[in-house]
């Protein structure tokens, strides 16, 4: 039991030493030299709703910017997309769809199907619609320069293969 009394006395002596140190530190510092700024330096926000509205309008602006980028990107056609349009158009012509060209005649029916498909795409009368970024787009909705660039590339390949 004597040992436990010594432990209790030891603990109480330590606590009083720390309490004495805290009191000495508090007495030594004044408000002017402390790390805490006086109340007069704090800014009072009149309403937090202005910050919320600013953040909301900023989010709207960012959302509109992303939508505009998406629309601009949607108008660019990739080589895979044009190849898919050509393949689907070829498939439908094989199954009996009539060509939608401006000068439809018996000569059109005798032409190579690839010539007819390219003519439909160049005239903008190709009936194939693809979905891109949630929008249904026809050949007319895409950038004409990009479309022409990819068609020329595909035609060069076909000419090398002696298909066109």
UniProtKB/Swiss-Prot annotation:
Acidic residues: bias regions: 1-35
Gene3D superfamilies noted in UniProt: 3.90.940.10
Main location: virion
EC id: 2.7.7.6
Keyword Transferase: yes
Catalytic activities: RNA(n) + a ribonucleoside 5'-triphosphate = RNA(n+1) + diphosphate
BP terms from Gene Ontology: DNA-templated transcription
Enzyme class: transferase
A cellular-component GO term for this protein: virion component
Keyword field: DNA-directed RNA polymerase, Early protein, Nucleotidyltransferase, Transcription, Transferase, Virion
InterPro entries: DNA-dir_RNA_Pol_19kDa_poxvir, RPB6/omega-like_sf
GO MF annotation, one: DNA-directed RNA polymerase activity
Region described as Disordered: 1-39
Keyword Transcription appears in the UniProt entry: yes
Localization per record: Virion
Induction comment: Expressed in the early phase of the viral replicative cycle. Expression seems to continue throughout virus infection.
Function (record text): Part of the DNA-dependent RNA polymerase which catalyzes the transcription of viral DNA into RNA using the four ribonucleoside triphosphates as substrates. Responsible for the transcription of early, intermediate and late genes. DNA-dependent RNA polymerase associates with the early transcription factor (ETF), itself composed of OPG118 and OPG133, thereby allowing the early genes transcription. Late transcription, and probably also intermediate transcription, require newly synthesized RNA polymerase.
Assembly with partners or alone: The DNA-dependent RNA polymerase used for intermediate and late genes expression consists of eight subunits Rpo30/OPG66, Rpo7/OPG90, Rpo22/OPG103, Rpo147/OPG105, Rpo18/OPG119, Rpo19/OPG131, Rpo132/OPG151 and Rpo35/OPG156. The same holoenzyme, with the addition of the transcription-specificity factor OPG109, is used for early gene expression.
Family under the similarity heading: Belongs to the poxviridae DNA-directed RNA polymerase 19 kDa subunit family.
Protein name in the entry: DNA-directed RNA polymerase 19 kDa subunit
Native source organism of the sequence: Variola virus (isolate Human/India/Ind3/1967)
């Amino acid at each position: 039991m004597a040992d436990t009394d010594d432990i209790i006395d030891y603990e109480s002596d330590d606590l009083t030493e720390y309490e004495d140190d805290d009191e000495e530190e508090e007495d030594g510092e004044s408000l002017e030299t402390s790390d805490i700024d006086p109340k007069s330096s704090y800014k009072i926000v009149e309403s937090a709703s202005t910050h919320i509205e600013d953040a909301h309008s900023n989010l709207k602006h960012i959302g509109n910017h992303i939508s505009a980028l998406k629309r601009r990107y949607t108008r660019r056609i990739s080589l895979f997309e044009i190849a898919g349009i050509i393949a689907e158009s070829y498939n439908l012509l094989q199954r009996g769809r009539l060509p939608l060209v401006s000068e439809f005649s018996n000569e059109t029916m005798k032409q190579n199907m690839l010539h007819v498909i390219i003519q439909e795409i160049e005239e903008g009368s190709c009936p194939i619609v693809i979905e891109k970024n949630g929008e249904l787009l026809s050949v007319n909705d895409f950038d004409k320069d990009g479309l022409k660039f990819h068609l020329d590339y595909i035609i060069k390949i076909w000419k090398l293969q002696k298909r066109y």
